[in-house]
Amino acid sequence: MRNWKTLLASVLAVSMGIGSAVFAQDEPAAPPMTDIPRNETIIINNPEQPATNPGWFNIWVAGSGGGTSNGLHQLVMDTLWFIDPDAGLKGSTYNELATGPAEYNADFTEMTVKLRQGVLWSDGTEFTADDVKYTVETQIATPGFTWSAQFADQVASIDTPDKYSVHFVLKKPNARFHSIFSVRWGGAWIMPKHIFEAQADPKSFDFNPPVGLGPYTLHSFDPNGAWYIWQKRADWDKTAMAEWGEPAPKYVVYRSIPSVDKRLIEMVNGNLDMIHDLSPEGMFSLAKQAPTARGWFPGFPYAHPDPTLPMIIFNSQNPKFQDKRVRWALALMLDPLEISMASYRGAATLSAIAMPPTGTHTDDYFAPLQDWLINYELDTGTSKIKPYDPTVGERIAEMVRPQFGDAVPTDLEAIHKSFGYGWWKKDLKAAGELLTAAGFTKNGDQWLMPDGQPFAFTIKTFTEGVMNRLGTDVAQQWTQAGVQVTAEVAPFIFRDDLPEGTYEAATAWSIETWGGNPDLSYFIDSWHSSYIAEAGKRQPPRNWQRWQDPRLDAIIEKVRSTDFSDHDANVAIGNEFIKLMVDEMPIIPVMSFNVFSAYDTRVWTGFPAAESNPYANIVNNWSNSKYILTQLKPAK
């Protein structure tokens, strides 16, 4: 198959403001816009660096140097279900290539899926059950493909009772097997059988141009990987996405713009419609400079809370952190307002519980649990205290109001969803009582462990950004409270330090949820004690803290045997998990991962908004951001 055309991009001068221009020698090339009408085009910032292998579209091969969030997995790929981290258009779960939910037998050892009829691949070939069967069997037979290990571990057999039905027999019961085909950020994409079966080696096939089930096809791309242009299919109505409407833009451009400042400038100048992420300071600047631009919230704190929970992780295999009184003491040494200001300049959405405060979780978990949290008692060994402060969100709002004025919400519900419901009180007296009860003593201002050695450790953190700021700040707060903590930058924290256990404490995350569904399965199954590696050996994702408890295993086993669609049962399990995590404090939850995504409404309107129509996630490298295109309308 021939390679699709590439367009050589000229070096462009980029306007840096009124009356000045800077020759952008070090910036990736901008896409040529002369051949595509601006009023029919949406231009989106791709957060990936320019692709090192730009013509590679075989998304099933990891580490190939091709792009993923360059439009490939948003506009071209498709699978059985999508789960939005927010409200969704008709609920957060989308039956995409499937016509309805997965159908399991009584013991969850078999799963049947009914498929949409009339869906066409972009080359006109009909999508059928044979494509799903081929995808699974090819993945299993091809180690090195992204989903090979998961399918091989779980699928005993797959057959197609008819052209639009797929039946799986599983190797062991699993009420969440369908989640492999459920997109949160990405998922197990369906392969076009008629294309790949003709390849001698499917792993070395570049899949250029990609043949997809989505409503767009490749128009052109930069040979240096800086931009990709996609064109709407004439037969877009033969895709599953057509159920939610016609995507409005005829063309979609994804641009890699590594410089945060350059992203800001391009949006101010009208050359960018959606930004994946800015720094907090960049977002504040955009709000002042571009009246047609905004973030997820209409005013401060602007950012979209992702269903990811930045936290302080303790290595539970380290004796320093094996007593929950010590972990609780460390939590009570921290000032949540200082954390918010240091990490996000006040734009953090704090969480006292082991759940990101985003999507439907605020209604399913945070609001209903407020009374329990307010009345929660902690025995310090000397006294009983109620450590939860439900006014933290309001206090942060008041703290930033002098600077940001009317941009800061005043409605209590809006404050809770923007800044969080509450957090733990800074209580050095209670922290000291807990440490004393655990056998610690104090020498001057320094806490000593039961063996007489200074209580000191290192906290590993990111190289930059809000996570680095968080790590640096908590280290300073603990040091001021008498625990000598040093923040240490770990450039490959998720690749090396966390899985290898070569850390004492860290700022990172081990909880990621669906966001739009109360089910915990996206992260919690990996927390089962059966997956915990011995000290010195590599830990599989995501239980980086290596914490185990029989009560946690029992919760995980309940999740495995509970129907995904049973909302109330899954909320009950979630509450059980949250309360256990509060009691034991194996990690200190801090906040959601707030992404300063932005959009401009000069060319397109109809974007989702937190306060009025939160139908989709505006963080545009997520595959489910594609639904936004069906709701857009030309601004003029």
Task: Walk through the language-model features, giving the residues of each.
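Detector for C-terminal structural segments
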Residues: 26-27, 33-36, 46-50, 71-72, ...
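Surface-exposed binding/hinge segments that line
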Residues: 35, 114, 148-198, 215-217, ...
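N-terminal lobe/hinge region of extracytoplasmic solute-binding protein
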Residues: 43-106, 137, 211
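A short beta-strand/turn structural motif
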Residues: 53, 57-64, 70, 74, ...
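Gly/Pro-rich hinge or "lid" segments in bacterial periplasmic/extracellular proteins
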Residues: 74-88, 184-247, 251, 261-262, ...
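Aromatic-rich, solvent-exposed beta-strand/loop patch
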Residues: 100-103, 122, 169-191, 210-262, ...
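Extracellular/periplasmic solute-recognition and catalytic clefts
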Residues: 139, 146, 157-158, 219-231, ...
